[in-house]
């Protein structure tokens, strides 16, 4: 089931997506192009995993991590499907990252990998945007690079009960219709279940917490005006355009 939230005719709706149509609580149909999309749920904590694909580490000239390399993605960065990303004034190199996002369904603490997927509510698509200008200091990745307002597009759906194996999904990222990035979740260094075991060993995960599971190789620069379309097999497509920097927006 593909769950979503949207505004239509001045009202907030919790709906479901079926065969190209949005159905609200009353069963009324809405055109996906005629609504204002919201985040599909209200996220709790949002954690990211850096360098979880060997080919991405290699394209950056970095070593594979010996254990999952975690970071926070602050909630102020989150942006729904079709929301406009704010390009920081003066930024030299900004890029997209298509990622499978895992949504926790019930409290998770010290759970083994073989049981971890039982605690997953569903999955969605994330775009872990980065200004690489600020990934050259000693802390990787710095919040200034990844935690900016609008730098965490998420959605469009919370997909529940449809993903049989999170390690068997194809990921793709397009910029202005051109395929820029393609990978497969089977290439993760640490699987979804292994990540949940690792994180829950020292931190309680709660309902609607989100884990961004890393990106494969294929990053490239994006600029104001570009349209990013991220697709994950069975999860739909997350699309956002990059707007021009505000005169008050600073790197």
Regions found by a protein language model. Name each.
Residues 17, 33-39, 56, 64, ...:
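Catalytic-pocket segment enriched in acidic/His residues
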Residues 55-57, 78-81, 109-112, 131-134:
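Short, well-ordered, mixed-charge alpha-helical segments that flank or form enzyme active sites
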Residues 89-92, 108-113, 158-162:
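Short helix-to-loop capping/linker segments positioned immediately adjacent to catalytic or ligand/cofactor-binding
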Residues 109-123:
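N-terminal accessory regions of nucleic-acid-interacting proteins
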Residues 2-91, 96:
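Extended, compositionally biased flexible segments
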Residues 72-86, 108-109, 150-157, 217-220:
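Short catalytic-site patches enriched in acidic/histidine residues
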Residues 98-100:
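Ligand-binding beta-strand-loop-alpha-helix segment within the catalytic cores
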């Amino acid at each position: 089931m593909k769950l979503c939230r949207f505004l239509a005719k001045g009202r907030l709706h919790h709906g479901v997506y079926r065969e190209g149509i949005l159905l609200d609580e009353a069963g009324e149909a809405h055109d996906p192009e005629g609504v204002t999309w919201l985040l599909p749920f209200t996220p709790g904590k949002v954690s990211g995993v850096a360098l979880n694909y060997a080919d991405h580490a290699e394209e950056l000239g970095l070593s594979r991590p010996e254990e999952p390399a975690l970071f926070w993605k602050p909630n102020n960065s989150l942006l729904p499907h079709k929301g406009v990303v704010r390009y920081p004034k003066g930024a030299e190199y900004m890029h997209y990252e298509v990622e499978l996002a895992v949504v926790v369904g019930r409290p998770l603490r010290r759970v083994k990998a073989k049981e971890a997927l039982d605690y997953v509510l569903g999955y969605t698509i994330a775009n872990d945007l980065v200004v690489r200008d600020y990934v050259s200091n000693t802390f990787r990745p710095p919040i200034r690079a990844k935690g900016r307002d609008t730098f965490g597009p998420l959605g469009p759906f919370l997909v529940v009960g449809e993903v049989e194996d999170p390690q068997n999904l194809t990921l793709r990222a397009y910029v202005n219709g051109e395929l820029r990035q393609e990978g497969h979740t089977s290439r993760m260094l640490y699987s979804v279940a292994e990540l949940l075991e690792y994180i829950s060993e020292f931190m309680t995960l709660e309902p609607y917490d989100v884990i961004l599971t890393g990106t494969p190789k294929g990053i490239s620069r994006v600029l104001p005006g570009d349209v990013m379309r991220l697709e994950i097999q069975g999860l739909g497509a997350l699309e956002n355009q990059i707007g021009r920097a505000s005169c008050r927006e600073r790197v």
